[in-house]
């Protein structure tokens, strides 16, 4: 399972652009009348379908559970992997000095591992919400600036508030919030799965991967697959091609910053990474 996770998590970034490409292709090949008819007659293609409501609209409530489950696994496995960094004494002549060194240094090392990784994941968690907030501020304001408005008549500038008022975005250039949001939170989980599976392989810690670890990983993967299915509907039946392309591209801003830019900021590296 770990090896398969390592492989698929490395390829995950290709899934979402491929979905946009296929959706764009189908929107050219299949008439809009056919697509609209399918969307109106099939319950699973409507934005109000149960999967979309639970796994997309409520994803912000679900995602922290998945993220912190993977964070716990990362911290636990890093902790176990470093338990043997400081060797125990192997002879009686070494007992007094070596054992004293071990007992003095191990608590410090243990505390450093835990504190650094907790700080790292707290930083990732905050950055996810901050960057997505900025993304959606941009998306919503572009929509308003290009003549869009909420059908509820409330003059709100937030797509989320418009939905809660049972309104719909009308007019305007509507960058796909579904793609931006689901790609962002999915890629963060994919990156965590990749880091975890790579670490387990590098440290040869397959023996620690018990049924509970596998169950946790399976739940995360199942939700990721559901999000991919939801995005297939968005890619084929909703938004213009450019709106989907921009939504997908904006979805990569958050994970790229967290996993590729943040680790290269020297002043923060010693505080966030082992």
Curated annotation (Swiss-Prot):
GO molecular function terms listed in the Swiss-Prot or TrEMBL record = coenzyme A diphosphatase activity; hydrolase activity, acting on acid anhydrides, in phosphorus-containing anhydrides
Name any GO cellular component annotation. Answer: endoplasmic reticulum membrane
**Which residue windows are transmembrane per the record?**
12-32, 61-81, 125-145, 171-191, 216-236, 248-268
Instruction: Write down the chemical reaction(s) this protein catalyses.
Output: an acyl-CoA + H2O = an acyl-4'-phosphopantetheine + adenosine 3',5'-bisphosphate + 2 H(+); (9Z)-octadecenoyl-CoA + H2O = S-(9Z-octadecenoyl)-4'-phosphopantetheine + adenosine 3',5'-bisphosphate + 2 H(+); (5Z,8Z,11Z,14Z)-eicosatetraenoyl-CoA + H2O = S-(5Z,8Z,11Z,14Z-eicosatetraenoyl)-4'-phosphopantetheine + adenosine 3',5'-bisphosphate + 2 H(+); hexadecanoyl-CoA + H2O = S-hexadecanoyl-4'-phosphopantetheine + adenosine 3',5'-bisphosphate + 2 H(+)
Spans within the Lumenal topological domain = 33-60, 146-170, 237-247
Q: Which Pfam families does the entry mention?
A: FIT
List where in the cell it is found: Endoplasmic reticulum membrane; Vacuole
Record's InterPro entries? FIT, YFT2
Topological region Cytoplasmic = 1-11, 82-124, 192-215, 269-274
Q: Which domain of life is it from?
A: Eukaryota
Keywords assigned by UniProt? Endoplasmic reticulum, Hydrolase, Lipid biosynthesis, Lipid metabolism, Membrane, Phospholipid biosynthesis, Phospholipid metabolism, Transmembrane, Transmembrane helix, Vacuole
Any GO BP:
lipid droplet formation
Q: How does it sit in the membrane?
A: Multi-pass membrane protein
Stated EC number for the protein is 3.6.1.-
**EC class of the enzyme, as a word:** hydrolase
Q: Cross-referenced HAMAP family, in alphabetical order?
A: YFT2
Q: What does this protein do?
A: Fatty acyl-coenzyme A (CoA) diphosphatase that hydrolyzes fatty acyl-CoA to yield acyl-4'-phosphopantetheine and adenosine 3',5'-bisphosphate. Preferentially hydrolyzes unsaturated long-chain acyl-CoA substrates in the endoplasmic reticulum (ER) lumen. This catalytic activity is required for maintaining ER structure and for lipid droplets (LDs) biogenesis, which are lipid storage organelles involved in maintaining lipid and energy homeostasis. May directly bind to diacylglycerol (DAGs) and triacylglycerol, which is also important for LD biogenesis.
**UniProt record similarity statement:** Belongs to the FIT family. Yeast FIT2A/YFT2 subfamily.
Q: What is this protein called?
A: Acyl-coenzyme A diphosphatase YFT2
Q: Which organism is it from?
A: Saccharomyces cerevisiae (strain ATCC 204508 / S288c) (Baker's yeast)
């Amino acid at each position: 399972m770990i090896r398969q996770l390592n492989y698929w998590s490395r390829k995950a970034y290709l899934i979402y652009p491929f979905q946009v490409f296929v959706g764009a292709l189908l929107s050219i090949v299949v008439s809009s009348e056919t697509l609209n008819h399918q969307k109106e007659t099939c319950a699973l293609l409507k934005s109000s379908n149960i999967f979309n409501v639970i796994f997309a609209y409520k994803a912000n409530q679900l995602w922290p559970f998945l993220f912190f489950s993977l964070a716990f696994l990362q911290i636990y496995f890093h902790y176990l992997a470093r338990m043997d960094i400081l060797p125990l004494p192997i002879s009686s002549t070494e007992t007094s000095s070596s054992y004293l060194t071990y007992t003095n240094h191990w608590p410090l090392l243990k505390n450093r591992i835990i504190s650094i990784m907790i700080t790292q994941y707290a930083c990732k968690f905050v950055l996810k919400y901050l960057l997505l907030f900025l993304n959606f501020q941009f998306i919503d304001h572009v929509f308003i600036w290009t003549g869009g408005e909420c059908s509820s008549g409330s003059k709100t500038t937030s797509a989320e508030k418009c939905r809660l008022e049972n309104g719909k975005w009308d007019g305007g250039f509507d960058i796909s919030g579904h793609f931006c949001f689901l790609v962002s939170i999915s890629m963060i989980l994919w990156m965590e799965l990749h880091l975890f599976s790579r670490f387990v392989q590098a440290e040869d810690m397959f023996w620690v991967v018990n049924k509970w670890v596998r169950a946790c990983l399976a739940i995360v993967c199942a939700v990721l697959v559901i999000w991919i299915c939801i995005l297939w509907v968005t890619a084929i039946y909703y938004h213009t091609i450019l709106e989907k392309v921009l939504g997908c591209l904006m979805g990569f801003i958050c994970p790229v910053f967290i996993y590729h830019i943040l680790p290269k900021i020297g002043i923060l590296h010693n505080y966030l990474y082992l």
